[in-house]
Each structure stands twice: as structure tokens, then as C-alpha cells.
């Protein structure tokens, strides 16, 4: 069975056999539509069903209002007939192929209380292509976890990852207690549609915890291109000592178009900077977001709160781009 899937407004058409999800069918056809977690948790792959029938698995993201508007999640919906969808298509990703690469642990640096910065070296013949902001799956002993790439494309070709230690986490135990330098690992990627869009709007980057990793990659890429858009970086942490890098402050000192505000959400008597929820700090400085693009990476709760509050302060819904951390299943 071959079913046609037509995307609007691009007019792109691909086929599905009805047994794979709409998202997987699209990616198998090298058609890149919005997605992130691929398991129905983050909601990035939300699309509007214009016509046709789909079989959708249960998910916790779509509201009754979403369903009434015809919204589906392409990562957990399968086509039952020819269908038409209102969903973004990204030709910028058409030249990028997801592959599995061998790599070695070139270095590991433990910073702060619970963060490890990994540098992975690929073979000289393995040239991974990605857009700043995308993520990879790190594969160790048959297990995998998704991590955002923390450095811009180019450089020495290494892949930088920022990993937070999770209490009783199997993968965390491997990374923090068992990994050895030069150990052979594998990565699969790149994945995701989290990258900087090419327009002239000023940018707000919103990061929670190690959500700073893709922000670092995207800002580095903007600097490398000498992009002069106004960039506002807000990075939230529970306490002042949790900030594990000073590079954002260095950017702000060196580049007049880059502005940086670290925000502490917890009780820290030594902290003299911005406090509270990191997205609320944005609204205190920029109460009207109607002329901005926002890129947010962090917990699902942070992403959801930021999206709702930012839209209420003028941000166009299609100008909010996010990559939410979701728990491993």
C-alpha cells in the first residue's frame, strides 16, 4: 500500500506504506519536518490534518483544543489514507544525512557539581554534517541517549557534548564513573529541526541547565558567520555556582550585538544577578516579543511555560522554536 502525504504550504509530496509513522516516512524520504523527541512527549512535531485519515497513538501533549483544530503529532500518527498536512518543511536539512559514526573519547572534563563535557573524535574520513542546534544519539554498550551538539560545525571536527549527572541513571553512571579516554563509542545523527532560521529578526536564546549546549553551538555559528543580529541569551540555573561556563559572558564583552543574562531560580544568598524563572527574566527585559525569534532548550516544563507566556506577550507562535529535554523511557 502506497499512500500520498502532501505538505502545505510547501506542496511537497512523499509516500507512506501506512505501517511507519508519518514522521519516519518523511525522514525516510529525506523530507525534514519539525520534530525533536520522536516519542510524543515534546510536541515539536505537531501538524494540522487538512484532509484524510490517520491512526494516532495516545499522547500527553495535545489538548482538547488542539484536537478540535485537527492537530496530530506526526511522530505517533500513521496515515490510513492519502492525507494533507499543514506543517513546516525544512529544505535546509535536505543535504544532511543521519548516519552512525564510530568515535573515541578525546577528552572528558568534569565541571561544577554534576556536569561532564565530552569531546568525541571521529575518524579523519568521517565528516559529520550538521546544523548548529541539532543533536546526536550517543551509543554505549548497546544503550543510547540523546545529547545536543555543543559546538558549531567546523573547527577540529570533534563533537562536544554537555552531560548532566542523573541520580541513579544508568547512562550517567557509565559516563561519570566508567568511561576511559580513547574508549571506542558510537554516535548516530544528526537529528532534530532545532537550528537558527535565516531571517533578520533579533533572537532570544533561552536555556535551562545543559540546555545551554545547543545555544552555545548556535551562537558560535552566528559569530563565525559574522551575523550582526541582536542576540539575547538567558541561561537559568538553580544557583550561581551551577553555571559551568563563562563563555557567554565572554561573547557579550567581545561582541556588541550579544547580550547575556544569567538567572538563578533557587535560594542563593551570594547571587546578586537576576533571579526567578528564566523565561520571566526575559519578559522583564523584553515585554513585547512581537519582533523576535525565540529558541528555547531545557525541561519540558520550562518550554511549555515559556511558550505560553511569550505568546501572551506578542510572540508569534511560529517564531518559537524549542528542543525539550524528555526523560528516557
From Swiss-Prot:
EC number: 1.17.1.-
Domain of life: Bacteria
Pfam families named in the record: FAD_binding_6, Fer2, NAD_binding_1
GO molecular function: 2 iron, 2 sulfur cluster binding; metal ion binding; oxidoreductase activity
Protein name (Swiss-Prot/TrEMBL): CDP-6-deoxy-L-threo-D-glycero-4-hexulose-3-dehydrase reductase
Enzyme class: oxidoreductase
Domain 2Fe-2S ferredoxin-type: 2-93
Organism: Yersinia pseudotuberculosis serotype I (strain IP32953)
Function according to Swiss-Prot or TrEMBL: Participates in the conversion of CDP-6-deoxy-D-glycero-L-threo-4-hexulose to 3,6-dideoxy-D-glycero-D-glycero-4-hexulose together with CDP-6-deoxy-D-glycero-L-threo-4-hexulose-3-dehydrase (E1) in two consecutive steps. The detailed mechanism of E3 is not yet resolved.
PROSITE patterns found in the cross-reference section: 2FE2S_FER_1 (PS00197), 2FE2S_FER_2 (PS51085), FAD_FR (PS51384)
Gene giving rise to this polypeptide: ascD
